[in-house]
Structure formats: C-alpha cells, structure tokens
Amino acid sequence: MLLSKAEWDKEQLIRNLREEWGIVDEEPDEGDEDVENSDDAVVMRVGNMMLIVTLFHGHIPDNEAEINAENNYMWPEAIEAAKAHKAHIMVAVLGEEEKLLERGKLFTKAMAVCCKQKYATGVYTSGVVFEPRFYEGLADMIKEDELPIFNWIWFGLYRREGGLNGYTLSLIHI
C-alpha cells in the first residue's frame, strides 16, 4: 500500500479487520509483545496463518512502484501516485499449513482494509498499482463467496502490429 505520508492509524486497521471481515488475533501471545506493541507493526494469528502488517517509513526502492504503475492502463494517475508516495504498508501472510486460496483471501482482506487508511494512495501488488477504492471494491467479491481473481491476477493489454494482445501477471502463484 503506497502512502502519501509516513503515518497510519494502527488501531483503525485492527478495528476495520474485525468489523469488516471478522479478523481478530486468535492467539494473543505475550512472546510477540515487542512486535505487536510496535507502532509500525500488527501481528495476528488467524487460523493456521500469521498476518503481518508493517508500516515502512520510506519510498519503495529502485523506482519499483513507479515502473509497475505503468502497467495500469485503466488508471492513468497510477504513475503519479507511485512517484509521490512517501511510505508504504507491507502485508504478509505466513502459514504453509493453510491452503494457498485461504492465504490469498486473508491477504486480500488485509489489503482492502489498508485501502481505508487516511494516506493510502495506491495498492502495489500483482505487478501493477491499483487505485485503492477499485481494489477495495474488487475485494468485496469475497463477501459474496466469490474468489477475488481481479485482485490476484492482472489482465494486461498491449497493442502490436497484429492487433490487441493480452497477458497476465501473478497467475503462476494461483
């Protein structure tokens, strides 16, 4: 999640996870107290998975976000949002015991909640930068018991001499 300012509302994030998706830390562990009490990290156990959401103070290195923002032909402002970001939130879901689909759904839910952060300007995932409200809306498919494939797979288009061509990004991980 790209941010225009190096700030987040950690409590809002935790509240939104609970209220929007019913996600709560199922095994509060005193051993993780240092990380969990950090202003820049949220660590939760959800089923057999661990959800980690971390605020990073700084620009994503090597213009990676800007380069990938060029892939979004549906949101011309993606490049400017990527160039202007001052910080970012990284979401990770760990847990080999859980099926990949369940890990993917948890990741998508957490990213959708990050879209509600005050300074959220772009969602950098799947080799592209999405507009936050667009990503959040697509994630709502999960509430209808549908897979959020448009959050997971970018369907790119490009023109060549023979006409319009298509490609996907992130399909290999599904």
Where are these regions (language model features)?
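Short cationic amphipathic helices and targeting signals
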Residues: 1-4, 89-91
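N-terminal low-complexity, intrinsically disordered segments
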Residues: 6-79
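Polar/charged alpha-helical tracts
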Residues: 11-15, 19, 136, 140, ...
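Low-complexity, flexible helical/coil segments
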Residues: 34-40, 124-130, 159-161
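Noncatalytic linker/hinge segments flanking ATPase motor cores
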Residues: 41-47, 129-136, 163-168
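Internal, hydrophobic cores of structured domains that mediate oligomerization or house catalytic pockets
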Residues: 56-154
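Long, hydrophobic alpha/beta structural blocks
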Residues: 93, 158-170
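Conserved small/polar residues in nucleotide/adenosyl-binding loops
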Residues: 172-174
